[in-house]
Amino acid sequence: FMTAHITAASLVSENKVLTHPASVDTISTSGGQEDFVSMAPWAGRKCLRVIDNVRNILAIELLTSTTINELFHAPLKMARCTQPVIKLLKKHVHFSKGDRPLHTDIKIINDLIKTNRILSWVNKNYELK
C-alpha cells in the first residue's frame, strides 16, 4: 500500500498548487482598458479538481486503513461511528493480502463518497447521541 500513500501525498501536493489564488494570475485585456478580469471560471475548474483529489485521498485512506484493520488487526474493534463505514466498504471492496491493482477499489470508494452513499449509510446505521 506504499504506492497508494505516495499517490495520496502527490494529490495533496497538487492541491497545494491548485489552491493558489486565481486572482493573482489576472491578465490585462482590451489593451489595458479593462480594470477587472474575472478569474472565476479558472478558479471554479481548480476547485472542482481539488474536490476530486480530496475524494481520491479519502478513498485511499479508507481503503488502506480498512484493509490493514481487516487483515492484520482483526478483531480490533473500531469506533461505533466507523463500524457502519467498514460494513459498507466490505459490501463493495474485497480486502486481500495479495498484491493487486488498487485503482478499481479506489474508484469504487470514490464513487461511494461522491454519491453520498457513505454519508447516507452512516446516518442510517449510526445514531448520534
Task: Label the predicted regions.
Residues 1-129:
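C-terminal auxiliary extensions adjacent to catalytic cores
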